[in-house]
A protein has these predicted regions:
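Carbohydrate-active catalytic/glycan-binding domains of CAZyme proteins
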Residues: 1-127
Length: 127
């Protein structure tokens, strides 16, 4: 597979739609262009209905792309105090073969180590 650029998954702030998944692309890693006309690419309606700190990995076993993020949503009125002391207990996981059609998996109580074991299987040892 030949790579022709970079894809950046991110959120843009604490506004109502700011805590969702946005994509930007770059050919050189320095100059970025918002995709989807600057609108969210993925919007969560489960858990706290927010998406923060998304990142993309590729499953080396099946070639699928996986986007993982927390469901923390400051815009919902929860506030930073609650976020710091109560945290967020959910991880949102999307899967895709092409990063165009995305499938949302159950967000509640994903065990993040299982996801990384598929991705970094040869680096993880022990139980």
């Amino acid at each position: 597979m030949e790579y022709t650029g970079y894809l950046f998954a991110h959120f843009i702030g604490e506004a109502q739609l700011g805590e969702q998944v946005y994509f930007a692309s770059s050919r050189d890693g320095l100059h970025w262009k918002d995709l989807n006309a600057g609108n969210p690419v993925l919007i969560s309606d489960i858990g706290e209905k927010g998406v923060r700190d998304p990142f993309i990995i590729r499953d080396v076993l099946n070639g699928k792309y996986i986007i993982i993020a927390t469901d923390l949503c400051i815009a919902s009125g929860k506030g930073w105090w609650s976020a710091q002391y109560n945290g967020s207990t959910n991880i949102i996981v999307w899967e895709s073969k092409d990063l165009v059609k995305m499938k949302l998996n159950n967000a509640f109580m994903h065990h993040i180590l299982k996801i990384f074991m598929n991705f970094l299987m040869h680096f993880i040892s022990g139980g």
